[in-house]
Amino acid sequence: MQKDLTKGSALKNIITFSLPFLLANFLQTFYGMADLFIVGQYNGAASLSGVSIGSQVMHMITVMLVGIAMGSTVMIGRYVGERKEKEKRMTVGNTIIIFMILSLIVTLILLFFINPIVSIMSTPVEAIQETTLYLKICFIGIPFITAYNIISSIFRGLGDSKSPMYFVAVACFFNIVLDFIFIGYFNMHAVGAAFGTVISQLMSVIVALFAIIKRKLIVIHRYHLKLHKKIIKDIFKIGFPISMQDGLIQVSFIIITIIANSRGVDIAAAVGVVEKIISFLFLVPSSMLSAISAICAQCVGTKQHQRARQTLRYGCFIALGFGIFFALTCQFISKEILSLFTSEAIVIMYGSQYLKGYVLDCVFASIHFCFSGFFTAYGYSIISFIHNVISIVLIRVPGAYITSKLFPETLLPMGLTPALGSILSAMICVSIFIIMKKKNKFDY
């Protein structure tokens, strides 16, 4: 259902629009962890490692595709705000064609390079076969995974964040049920997890298409599917920098994981657990980024620039409030949180140190996440790409390496490096915002 996000209370809009985002992201994260949990219950280390490594590769591919799709979300949102029905439908049509072609190309390339990918990930010898089979099935299913994410991006551009939440709930339900059937009953190991993932995404797409047809949400004719240079350019101008940024962030996570792995199995385990915890805590700023992008895109379309800045301000306050709460809470109960995931005292000790430092990132990241969403709505997603690259190259990766060498007995300094990177990103974002505002770049 199309919704006008430029009317009513700006605060109420951002809360009601971001909440389904948050729930959808939570389900998506839970969905990813379900595979690991169920495989771990029924199979050995080789299968678990295969799914873990394979899902990491698939997550990188997915976030990069979703990053490009953000271009569609923003452009559709603008045309909704401008009341340009023809351009809106053409953007939807072009999005469908572009990503159909892109998903097929990506699938063929990944299948061709599957063995080098498994090798680059430093896959243990025992897990190579399981990882390869898992990735092969998931790569074949990329068109379905892409279709789900594209449909969700279109709905969000139309101002509907609830429907994508329902779609991911469908995928989550089928994934868990199929995992128990394929892995628990048929003992299919990592292959079962892969089939469960692909089939559940397909079921989600079928439900989404059924909803679109039944409710007549998007009426597309053949001429809307004709590729238009300007529309394609606009989508990639916004989406490509986000895609590259998200891909680079995932690469930095892999590098930091490699650094942690070099410090021994206990530290590697501690860092792995904390990364999972942080992924949950970051659902709030991540959801706020997406919500601000969609809402502000409609505001740009109606030239309600003051309302767009008001949305940014409310988003920052909400995300910052949650970030401060998480940061303070984890300083006092970090060991208790770690004990939910492991009973090994040494892992809890290292994990507690790492979490106390890392959780501060929730405070500062909440600022630059919100600004990134705002910049994206105005078509300046390149700013988000630049500040993230600077942060990763200058602080996050070298900081993790240097602190691992200077402080071998503790993980606290290594945990602080992401927060330091986010402080730099926040400073860059605020500075650029002030400069661009003075030049009336947000009032055209």
Model-inferred region functions:
Residues 5-42, 56-71, 75, 100-107, ...:
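N-terminal transmembrane alpha-helices
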Residues 69, 138-156, 164-172, 193-206, ...:
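Short runs within selected transmembrane alpha-helices of multi-pass transporters and secretion channels
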Residues 16-35, 137, 171, 200-204, ...:
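Transmembrane helical elements of multi-pass membrane transporters/channels
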Residues 1-18, 76-141, 185-240, 296-361, ...:
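Short alpha-helical transmembrane segments in multi-pass integral membrane proteins
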